[in-house]
């Protein structure tokens, strides 16, 4: 039985978001072909003093790739920093060459460009706005705003350059020119270290550079974001941005997928700018720097993200991270009292829980997606921006083929070594498809969802206005209070099936004593907690990690598991079993009360199912 690949089946009629290569932008393809895996750069040659990191390529390789591109526009008499320059526009780069002998050349890669404008018509001045790297260390990406001011000889040249620049770098973006877009920013002022408002002030300067329309909403308490997700006017915004931890995003998704028009609503691009304690989604997509996230919002490229349906009886929740039971949820929920300590609260909570360890009995039912042991699971390529597995029509077959290919190549390599025919290592190193396949969502629909707005506008909002409502509300005492109905996502009713029916459909069961479990659909639950290194954003699979109370158990070993989770190495422990599954059922024993959490939020303690819905929502991602 398979419930993973699509949702056009009788019981699952939700269709995954389109990830077809036909929807890739030509600009993105060119950038991948010319500078694969590059961080967006401003590079000065020949000295190669770069403002940004140059990633995994040398300046010579970069220049060679760019030299192969066609020149779209050229002007040899432009003033930059009071010096005469030649300006070239190519498909992926703006080039500024100083004309004097020995002058250097600047390359502004298109992925850093956020906007431009004619700043002074009387002096023919033009300003380009960008967001470039602060550091050469690509593992610690931080970005800053940077402006490039040019002066042209006359109005004709000024307008000609403006037309070519906008056409090449801004109009080609998936959601069109940023100045014609409308985004809504929702922030939680109490999230994490309470820095969300400060973060907004910083990134809003970049939004101003792009001339994007911004509406700011500050949440006023629990479930406010859920209510916004349920009733906001879908036609007013093309992107929803969150400044918070994962909790606010979780709330909004549960409102969004409760709408009667959820099939249309789920296509709207969503962006998460980390401002909380966990920030699992941001870490899973490699966007932990707020300014880098804002750049990604402006650029507007998206990838689909899996969502899981969690069910207990008639109650349902949507999950974007995980279902946890045992020590992980114990630490997460019980350490809330130490939230003022920031990330330290989890370390303190873990230490206290290990000293007073709880052992839980129960059953863990799961429907295998792949019959792989954890050594084989470790060989699955990690998710990337152009991910072969996430883009596949059948991720399970793709994973099986990758593992099989690795085994064949390893066998061949071993044979070559034994026969001494080749002393070098020719083992298979999995290379993901880098042709560029970031899904742009439904571009035509997105472009028609909003009208042109000339100037940026910031509106502080406590409650939506009456004309923002698009759905009938179940009112209580006032217009500000209403009940959001359960999620409309269709799921299979596994909790109603007997064990005989489950076994007949290929389910398996683990029974005994457990320290805890983590069932996740993304790699990270926090910056220092990589739950499953081989989890993918859109493969339709749940990574089930089980911490066993077996003969090899010790508190020292458990402490090692928790500390090594910061790198993902904990899955190698003898205490850990790992499975790639399509669905699972947790049956905790009633001999002691425990904690079950969905995305870090406490739910009732009892029999619980989890089912993954592939490519359910649209997430803003980077393109490099």
Swiss-Prot record:
Catalytic activity: a sphingoid base + ATP = a sphingoid 1-phosphate + ADP + H(+)
Region spans: Disordered: 1-54, 407-445
EC number of this enzyme: 2.7.1.91
Keyword Cytoplasm attributed: yes
Regulation of this protein's activity per its record: Inhibited by N,N,-dimethylsphingosine; this inhibitor increases sensitivity to cisplatin.
Stored Pfam families: DAGK_cat, YegS_C
Residue numbers binding substrate: 244-247, 332
Chain sites annotated for binding ATP: 188-190, 219, 251, 276-278, 339, 345, 599-601
Keywords for the protein's UniProt record, in alphabetical order: ATP-binding, Cytoplasm, Kinase, Lipid metabolism, Nucleotide-binding, Nucleus, Sphingolipid metabolism, Transferase
UniProt KW Nucleotide-binding keyword: yes
Compositionally biased residues, Polar residues: 1-16, 427-441
Single GO MF annotation: ATP binding
Classification via PANTHER family: ACYLGLYCEROL KINASE, MITOCHONDRIAL, SPHINGOSINE KINASE
Name this polypeptide is given: Sphingosine kinase A
Source species: Dictyostelium discoideum (Social amoeba)
Name of the gene encoding the protein in the UniProt record: sgkA
């Amino acid at each position: 039985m398979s419930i993973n690949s699509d949702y056009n089946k009788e019981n699952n009629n939700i269709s995954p978001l389109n990830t077809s290569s036909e929807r890739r932008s030509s600009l993105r393809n060119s950038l991948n072909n010319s500078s694969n895996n590059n961080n967006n750069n401003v590079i000065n040659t020949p000295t190669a003093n770069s403002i940004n990191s140059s990633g995994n390529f040398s300046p010579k390789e970069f220049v060679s790739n760019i030299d192969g591109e066609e020149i779209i526009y050229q002007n040899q008499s432009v003033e930059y920093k009071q010096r005469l320059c030649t300006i070239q526009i190519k498909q992926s780069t703006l080039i500024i060459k100083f004309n004097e002998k020995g002058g250097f050349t600047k390359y502004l890669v298109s992925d850093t460009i956020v906007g431009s404008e004619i700043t002074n018509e009387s002096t023919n001045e033009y300003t380009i706005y960008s967001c470039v790297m602060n550091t050469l260390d690509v593992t610690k990406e931080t970005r800053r705003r940077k402006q490039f001011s040019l002066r042209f000889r006359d109005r004709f040249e000024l307008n000609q350059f403006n037309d070519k620049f906008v056409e090449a770098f801004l109009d080609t973006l998936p959601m069109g020119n940023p100045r014609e877009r409308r985004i809504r920013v929702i922030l939680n002022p109490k999230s994490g270290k309470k820095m969300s408002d400060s973060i907004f002030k910083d990134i809003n300067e970049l939004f101003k550079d792009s001339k994007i329309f911004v509406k700011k909403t500050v949440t006023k308490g629990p479930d406010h974001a859920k209510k916004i997700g349920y009733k906001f006017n879908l036609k007013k915004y093309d992107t929803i941005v969150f400044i918070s931890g994962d909790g606010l995003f979780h709330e909004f998704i549960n409102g969004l997928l409760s709408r009667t028009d959820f099939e249309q609503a789920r296509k709207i691009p969503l962006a998460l700018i980390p401002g909380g304690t966990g920030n699992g989604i941001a870490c899973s997509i490699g966007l932990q720097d707020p300014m880098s996230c804002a750049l990604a919002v402006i650029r507007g490229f998206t990838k689909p993200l899996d969502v899981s349906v969690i069910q207990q009886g008639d109650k349902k929740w949507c999950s974007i991270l995980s279902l946890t039971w045992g020590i992980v949820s114990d630490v997460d929920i019980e350490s809330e009292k130490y939230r003022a300590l920031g990330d330290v609260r989890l370390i303190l909570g873990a230490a206290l829980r290990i000293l007073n360890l709880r052992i839980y009995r129960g059953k863990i039912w799961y429907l295998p997606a792949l019959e792989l042991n954890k050594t084989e699971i470790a060989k699955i390529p990690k998710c990337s921006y152009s991910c072969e597995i996430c883009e596949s029509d059948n991720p399970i077959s793709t994973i099986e083929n990758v593992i099989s290919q690795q085994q064949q190549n390893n066998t061949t390599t071993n044979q070559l070594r034994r026969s001494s025919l080749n002393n070098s290592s020719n083992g298979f190193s999995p290379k993901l498809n880098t042709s560029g396949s970031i899904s742009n969502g439904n571009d035509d629909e997105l472009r028609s969802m909003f009208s042109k707005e000339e100037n940026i506008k910031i509106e502080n909002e406590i409650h939506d206005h009456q004309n923002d409502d698009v759905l009938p509300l179940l009112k209580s005492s006032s217009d500000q209070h209403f009940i959001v109905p359960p999620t409309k996502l269709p799921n299979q009713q596994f909790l109603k099936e007997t064990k005989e029916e489950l076994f007949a459909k290929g389910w398996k069961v683990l029974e005994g004593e457990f320290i805890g479990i983590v069932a996740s659909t993304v790699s990270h639950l926090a910056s220092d907690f990589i739950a499953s290194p081989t989890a993918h954003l859109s493969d339709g699979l749940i990574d089930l990690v089980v911490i066993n109370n077996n003969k090899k158990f010790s508190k020292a070993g458990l402490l090692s598991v928790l500390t090594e989770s910061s790198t993902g190495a904990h899955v190698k422990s003898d205490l850990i079993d790992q499975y790639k599954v399509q669905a699972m059922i947790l049956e905790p024993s009633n001999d002691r009360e425990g904690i079950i959490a969905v995305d870090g939020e406490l739910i009732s303690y009892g029999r619980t199912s989890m089912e993954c819905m592939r490519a359910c929502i649209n997430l803003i991602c980077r393109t490099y």
